[in-house]
Amino acid sequence: MANPFLSIIIANYNYGSMIGATIESVINQDCDDYELIIVDGGSKDNSVEVIKQYEKNIAWWVSEPDKGQSNAFNKGFSHARGEFITWLNADDILLPGTISAVKAALTSKPSADYATGNFVRFLNSDYTISEAKWGPHYLPYWLQGKGRYSVTFGPTTFWRRSVYEKLGPIDESLHYTMDTEYWARMMMAGHKQVRVNHYCWGFRMHEDSKTAEFGAHERSLKIKQTMDAEHDYIKKKTGYNPTAFWRYMGLAMRVLDGSAFRAIYNSKYIVGKKLTEYFEIKHKL
């Protein structure tokens, strides 16, 4: 059997009430050129029972204690066979048409090593979209490179498995910014990206999510301090620290390609709508 185009790794711990929707968001895609891998960290809720309901759709899965989210993703990537890889949090969803859009973008730009798309945040309570992030339509190679401009949004990034094998695993010492560190590593190594003009990722906002920790003021300050320390660590480790010049060049490109105006329009038009009003979601949430 030929290797799939994409390997999707879901990391889960005690999200039995949500992982079913996450899995369904993958298996309901309009492109089946993928494999699904699930790494459960030894959940104590009904997660395993839910995962077993979808075993026929899963290439490989395991439930055992791990060392955290990054460790779980690395474990999943070690079993991946796809040409490209990505991750998905067990409480989020892959939005409709994502795999097709990513495949089209990467096929049109075979020299690219990774693709990045856009995302929305939605409230778990009533599925209202609370934020819509739309990046640049086009990112020319001259704007990319060491210390230049980068636009990457978490699990909206899909990169070559060969790049992962070359750069090594995700840094498991980071709690909040492990994705930022990895994208910095890719850029500093000279790998180029192609933009996907599509909403790829639905980020579910709920009280148990990692970003929900930004609620209480004291807790927010502590988390900000942790994130600032992690960003300083990333700069020292990777050397990635874009100058103001390249940031302004990136903003200028966004004005020229129209994506800055699209982002403003989308934030006005989409935010406040129900997720199911804007996207053709055929599965449970």
Describe these PLM feature segments.
Residues 17-20, 45-53, 93, 97:
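Acidic helix N-cap motif at the loop->helix transition within catalytic regions
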Residues 136-223:
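Conserved nucleotide-sugar donor-binding catalytic segment
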Residues 1-27:
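N-proximal low-complexity "stem/linker" segments adjacent to membrane-targeting elements
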Residues 97-130:
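Conserved donor NDP-sugar-binding/catalytic core segment of glycosyltransferases
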Residues 85:
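Short aromatic/hydrophobic "clamp" motif used to bind/position activated sugar donors
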Residues 25, 32, 40-49, 89:
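A conserved acidic beta->alpha catalytic loop
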Residues 64-80:
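Glycine-rich, basic loop-to-helix element that forms the pyrophosphate-binding segment
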